[in-house]
Amino acid sequence: ITATAMKAAQIQPQAAVTLTTPTAVDFTSIPSWANRITALFSGVSTNGTSVPIVQLGDSGGFETSGYTGSVSIGSQTSAWTVVATPAAGFGITTTTAAGSAYTGKLILDRINGNEWIASGEWAQTTATITTNLLQGAKTLSATLTQVRLTTSGGSDQFDAGTFNVSYE
C-alpha cells in the first residue's frame, strides 16, 4: 500500500468557514483521487429568499447547469412535498425566507468517471421546523476539483452559520 493510497483512505477535513457576508464560499483544492465529498452545514442562513445551493466545478470553473434530482420537504404540520432541485446546483430546500437556518449534510459520491451522485439531509429549525431530503446527480465535463456554496439567485448573502467540506 502506498502513502497516496493510505491518504486517500482517510477523511480529509478542510478549514470550516464562518458565514457572515459572502455570496459564495469556494473550496478549490479537491484532489483528483477524491471519490466522496461531504459538505457540512451548521445553522446556515441567508439575508434573502434565494435557495442555498451547492455547485460542483472542474478545471474549467463551476458548472451552473445540468443538475438533476429532487428535494423532499416534510414537517409535523404538513404532508411531504417533492420538487425538482434547481438546474443551477443541488438545492437544500425548495423555498426559503431570510434568516431560515439549515443544519445537515450533502454527500457526493463519484459513481463513474466525472459522474457524481448527491444525497443530502437538513433540518430547518427556524420558523416552521422541517426536514429536507435531496437525491440528485451531476456529470461534470472534467475531473471535479472544487465545490461552491452559493444561492440560486447568486446575490443573497450568507449571514450566519458554518460551512465545511471534507473529502476521501
Q: Where are the predicted features?
A:
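Surface-exposed molecular-recognition determinants
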Residues: 4-168
